[in-house]
């Protein structure tokens, strides 16, 4: 949402918005001349011509009520993203249950390094351009494409990427079959679709097949491999990103780059010097090693723990903040299986987002079902207990999509 607000502001529009409390993003918006109100009130609308609401906002929101009362046009974030994207000649949209932000960033860094000057919308703060928005020329728009509430169907991609499909957002989709149908529609709307075959380590379209062979661990959780396209050897890739799953993300980024005729040397250079995104395996402290990541789905948590175990023999402590009661309840057994890979777990009160309390999907219930687990009702209590448990022989993974980055900030000092 903030990236769209910034783009509209830079186009000369008066933009205001509201959030519950100040964050790094809201402070940045204010520094760019955007008015930010803290708390949701009818008076915040003032003389707005239209209102943009994200997926977490419901009809009971006082600003939505006021907009309806005054007949002000209400658009979803997805609708606005679709409108903005259509101003560009080419649209690259990256979808999937996991890896969207990192893969979008890989594509963006490659295209920028190759001098393509894209406009980029990303679901995190890029370490390459220090924002979630980069404004370029009107030829190329690179964005994440989220499936929640069929949001990505507002886009008409020139090139789409489908990284993976999982049982996610079932509070909206209800069944996995509906999730798959939504992705099928997204693929149909795309002129070219890049998909993954993770068993064969290939990213492919109808005309291209990019394969990673001779994958090897280079140390510190990073990987290298030989890249091929349509069975022709391209060269070596040395990937500056932790985790074997990022090999698959990079194959998709390479495939997209080749579609747009980017030379392989530019691709390999960009991936060698890949900067990444904040809260994506972000190391916030070296001693002890503390890592912050957006992982909030069992598959992502599992990858984080296993990737870390690949390069350290330290005890693994996980601090995890569940994101929504419905996700935790629906995937409870998967969460338990993933978290049991850690040596010790600290579960922090659920980030409920748009939902009402449900004990069966709560952080407390999740914690009660785990051994070597501690439940915390606040970030401060979590920090004190974890700090007490650290001896210098542990690696701490701070995971979640809510405000658990506040805990990471406590350890970064």
Identify the meaning behind each predicted range:
Residues 17, 120, 160, 195, ...:
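Structural beta-sheet core signal
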Residues 336-394:
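C-terminal helical cap/extension that packs against the catalytic core
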Residues 35-47, 378-386:
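Short acidic low-complexity segments
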Residues 11-28:
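NAD(P)-binding Rossmann-fold cofactor-contacting core
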Residues 48, 381-413:
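A glycine-rich beta-strand to alpha-helix segment
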Residues 7-13, 30-31, 43-46, 55, ...:
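Phosphate-binding loop of NTP-binding sites
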Residues 19, 37-40, 75-82, 121-123, ...:
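Beta-strand->loop->alpha-helix junctions that form or flank phosphate-binding loops
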Residues 4-7, 11, 88, 219-221, ...:
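Nucleotide phosphate-binding/pyrophosphate-handling subdomain across enzymes
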């Amino acid at each position: 949402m903030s990236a769209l607000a910034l783009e509209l502001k830079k186009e000369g529009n008066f933009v205001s918005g509201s959030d519950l409390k100040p964050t790094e993003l809201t402070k940045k918006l204010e520094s760019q001349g955007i008015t930010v109100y803290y708390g949701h009130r009818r008076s915040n609308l003032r003389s707005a011509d239209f209102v943009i609401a994200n997926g977490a906002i419901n009809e009971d929101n006082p600003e939505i009520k006021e907009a309806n009362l005054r007949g002000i046009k209400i658009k979803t974030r997805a609708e606005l993203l679709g409108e903005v994207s259509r101003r560009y000649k080419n649209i690259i949209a990256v979808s999937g249950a996991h890896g969207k932000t990192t893969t979008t960033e890989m594509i963006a860094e490659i295209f920028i390094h190759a001098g393509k000057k894209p406009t980029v919308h990303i679901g995190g703060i890029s370490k390459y351009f220090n924002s979630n928005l980069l404004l370029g020329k009107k030829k190329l728009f690179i964005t994440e494409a989220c499936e929640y509430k069929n949001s990505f169907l507002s886009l008409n991609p020139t090139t789409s990427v489908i990284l993976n499909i999982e049982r996610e957002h079932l509070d909206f989709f209800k069944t996995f079959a509906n999730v798959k149908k939504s992705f099928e529609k997204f693929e149909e709307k795309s002129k070219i679709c890049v998909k993954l075959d993770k068993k064969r380590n290939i990213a492919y379209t109808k005309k291209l097949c990019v394969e990673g062979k001779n994958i090897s661990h280079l140390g510190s959780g990073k990987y290298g491999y030989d890249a091929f396209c349509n069975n022709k050897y391209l060269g070596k890739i040395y990937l500056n990103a932790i985790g074997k799953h990022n090999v698959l993300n990079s194959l998709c980024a390479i495939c997209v780059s080749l579609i747009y005729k980017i030379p392989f040397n530019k691709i390999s250079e960009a991936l060698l010097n890949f900067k990444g995104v904040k809260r994506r395996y972000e190391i916030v402290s070296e001693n002890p090693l503390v890592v912050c990541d957006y992982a909030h789905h069992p598959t992502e948590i599992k990858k984080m723990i296993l990737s870390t175990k690949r390069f350290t023999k330290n005890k693994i402590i996980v601090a995890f903040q569940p994101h929504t009661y419905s996700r935790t309840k629906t995937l409870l057994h998967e969460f338990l299986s993933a978290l049991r890979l850690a040596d010790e777990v600290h579960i922090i009160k659920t980030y409920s987002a748009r939902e009402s309390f449900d004990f069966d999907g709560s952080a407390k219930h999740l914690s009660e079902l785990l051994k070597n687990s501690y439940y915390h009702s606040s970030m401060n209590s979590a920090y004190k207990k974890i700090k007490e448990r650290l001896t210098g022989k542990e690696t701490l993974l701070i995971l979640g999509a809510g405000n658990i980055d506040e805990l990471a900030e406590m350890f970064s000092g």
